[in-house]
Curated annotation (Swiss-Prot):
Pfam families: IPPT. Keywords: ATP-binding, Magnesium, Nucleotide-binding, Transferase, tRNA processing. The keyword tRNA processing applies. This is tRNA dimethylallyltransferase. It comes from Sulfurihydrogenibium sp. (strain YO3AOP1). GO terms for molecular function: ATP binding; tRNA dimethylallyltransferase activity. HAMAP family: IPP_trans. Monomer. It catalyses: adenosine(37) in tRNA + dimethylallyl diphosphate = N(6)-dimethylallyladenosine(37) in tRNA + diphosphate. Substrate binds at residues 8-13. One of its GO terms (biological process) is tRNA modification. The record marks 97 as: Interaction with substrate tRNA. Coiled coil: none annotated. Catalyzes the transfer of a dimethylallyl group onto the adenine at position 37 in tRNAs that read codons beginning with uridine, leading to the formation of N6-(dimethylallyl)adenosine (i(6)A). The gene is miaA.
Length: 307
């Protein structure tokens, strides 16, 4: 199994599809927003044409109105791995959602499952209020995450209110060292300014492809703005434009800034992952990275076969 991780707009999708073609593999997505049907442009979901005939798993699995947890992801991930291996192919995992990657590769802690009623109440509060609560009940975990990382803040508070124990207690107890699968892991990195420029270009292309129309269609289908899915970057910023509260240009600027902030949080999250090798994507062409990963994978296979 090969895992390609990294921040948004680092070039993971293009690399993994070419790698799958080279190694006769199939792709498992590790993106928390690509699981939703009808949400394609704003999530940068690869189109059927962009997939170039490569089978993709854990994409379009639930409606935007349905709940989907890390536990659900792990179950779908395991099924995908089994299907791919039964075909005699290589699973290639790609994405930027570390909670999914961590859960699939190392398992879950003993923290309780999500309580969606409690979670909805927490999501109704503003970030600063939530973060202030977290600092009081779990300063250790609060110091590890950003004040705007609402998903992680809500999860940590949810665990605390359900158990009376800080989320950091469960993380420290699990340790996340034992692997559920053997894998060869890589994290794509890019020069900071280059990454910011790539994000701006990506957002512009999203608007050209019809992002506004996609969000309007979701609203017309009855998916409310309070849903977790509709609070994704690229969607929540369009909603006030549709309500005529902000201009289209302001909505676009918000998406760009929020995506940049999100990428910075991802970069921090992916630091110090000792089971993963960093690849400076800014310094290499795609074919050079392919050749490097291909050689590393073949060496890994040879090493395993001689043990």
């Amino acid at each position: 199994m090969i895992v390609i991780a990294g921040a948004t707009a680092t070039g993971k999708t293009e690399l993994c599809i070419k790698l799958a073609k080279l190694l006769d593999g199939e792709v498992i997505s590790a993106d928390s927003m690509m699981v939703y049907k009808y949400m394609d442009i704003g999530t940068a979901k690869p189109s059927v044409e962009e997939r170039e005939g490569i089978e993709h798993y854990v994409i379009d699995v639930v409606l935007p109105s349905q709940n989907y947890s890390v536990k659900d992801y792990i179950e779908d991930f395991d099924k995908a791995v089994q299907k791919i291996r039964e075909k005699g192919k290589i699973p290639i995992v790609v994405g930027g959602t570390w909670l999914y990657i961590q859960g699939a590769l190392y398992g879950l802690s003993d923290a309780p499952e999500s309580d969606w009623t409690l979670r909805e109440k927490l999501y109704s509060l503003v970030n600063l209020e939530l973060y202030t609560q977290l600092q009081k009940v779990d300063p250790e975990y609060a110091n590890k995450i950003h004040v705007n990382d609402k998903r992680r803040i809500v999860r940590a508070l949810e665990v605390y209110y359900l158990t009376g124990k800080p989320f950091s207690f469960f993380i420290n107890q699990h340790n996340f060292k034992s692997k559920r699968y053997n894998f060869l892991g890589f994290i794509l990195e890019r020069d900071r300014q280059e990454l910011m420029d790539r994000i701006e270009i990506r957002v512009e292309k999203m608007f050209e492809k019809g992002l506004v129309e996609e969000v309007k269609k979701l609203v017309d289908m009855g998916f409310k703005d309070s849903l977790t899915s509709m609070q994704a970057i690229g969607y929540k910023e369009i909603l006030p434009y549709l309500d005529k509260k902000i201009s289209l240009e302001d909505a676009k600027k918000c998406i760009i800034e929020n995506t940049k902030d999100f990428a910075k949080r991802q970069i921090r999250t992916f630091r110090n992952k000792t089971d993963f090798e960093k690849i400076e994507a800014s310094k290499f062409e795609v074919n050079e990275m392919l050749d490097y990963i291909y050689r590393k994978y073949n060496q890994e296979v040879r090493d395993v076969s001689t043990r």
